From Swiss-Prot:
The keyword Ribonucleoprotein applies. Belongs to the universal ribosomal protein uS13 family. This is Small ribosomal subunit protein uS13. Keywords: Ribonucleoprotein, Ribosomal protein, RNA-binding, rRNA-binding, tRNA-binding. InterPro entries: Ribosomal_uS13 (IPR001892), Ribosomal_uS13-like_H2TH (IPR010979). One of its GO terms (biological process) is translation. One of its GO terms (molecular function) is rRNA binding. Transmembrane segments: none annotated. Part of the 30S ribosomal subunit. Forms a loose heterodimer with protein S19. Forms two bridges to the 50S subunit in the 70S ribosome. It comes from Lactococcus lactis subsp. cremoris (Streptococcus cremoris). The lineage of its organism: Bacteria, Bacillati, Bacillota, Bacilli, Lactobacillales. GO terms for cellular component: ribonucleoprotein complex; ribosome.
Length: 51
């Protein structure tokens, strides 16, 4: 599992859903963060790179 803000987020879920496991991050916030970072909402957490 990946860790973000001290929270383990699931590898098999889409990143847009995985980010909602962080307290205070809902679906809309997750979408805004990904758009600002230029990351596709459809990518799986396990497929992310450190770039």
């Amino acid at each position: 599992m990946a860790r973000f803000a001290g929270v383990d987020i699931p590898n098999e879920k889409r990143i847009v859903i995985s980010l909602t496991y962080v307290f205070g991050v809902g679906l809309q916030t997750s979408k805004k963060v990904l758009a600002a970072a230029g990351v596709s909402e459809d990518i799986r957490t396990k497929d992310l790179t450190s770039d």
